[in-house]
Amino acid sequence: MENKKVALVTGGSRGIGKACAVELAKAGCDVIINYAGNEEAANKTVEELKALGSNSKAMKFDVSNQELVEAAIKEIMDEYKRIDVLVNNAGITRDGLFMRMSAQNWLDVINTNLNSAYFVTNPVSKIMIKQRSGAIVNMASISGIYGNAGQANYSTAKAGLIGFTKALAKELASRNIRVNAVAPGFIQTDMTKNLPQEQIVDKIPLKRLGEPEDIAKTVKFLALDTTYITGQVIGVDGGLVI
């Protein structure tokens, strides 16, 4: 039990984040999930993780608030003593044409999807440097690779995460810390349920939407299974970006 790896998954109560937490728990990690507001979903996820043998807990804090993040990381270290895996998954959408996009909708998405990666990764990377080991996986998107009309804020944030991933991978490699990103395509989650699925599926070579588990298995591979991959962005999109 003392050798179990400790993983922190932001936005881990539902959707892709929950699937990542479950996959890491199945692999033997003690998993801490962060959530923003849905306490019921978070508690349910923790129950599932504990049933898999994970010493899991849910922590409510705003990942875009540096002070709250640092307090949460300190609490994790006081209890778990280490952090081996970080999955920067927390994200929101505030879609709309750029001409009509409010400054608040722009800032909300940038703060939650991009700035949070700094606020969480900064203290966690210092812990990993002391451990001389660690794996960080950032949740990017195909929108950050080729852009998406109506998502200027989201595409900007995800493109920023890709640059962040590559730069940080170069900085931390000498400390045995790997940094990679996963770029999901259209995945069946609450964030995509209102999209015109038939039109989307027609553009996907595999002719279906992905499942959260498709992303989670890739995250688990990058976090735990490989030791010689860093600075990469792995597309999980059914062939949409070829």
Locate the predicted segments by residue.
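Substrate-binding pocket helix/loop in short-chain dehydrogenase/reductase
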Residues: 97-98, 105-110, 200
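Conserved glycine-rich cofactor-binding loop
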Residues: 13-15
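Active-site helix of classical SDR
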Residues: 121, 157, 165
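Residue(s) in the substrate-gating loop at a strand-loop-helix junction
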Residues: 141
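Short, small/polar-rich loop/turn modules that mediate ligand/substrate recognition or access, typified
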Residues: 173, 178, 229-231
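C-terminal substrate-recognition "lid" of short-chain dehydrogenase/reductases
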Residues: 211-236, 241
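Alpha-helical segment proximal to the catalytic Tyr-Lys
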Residues: 126, 170-174
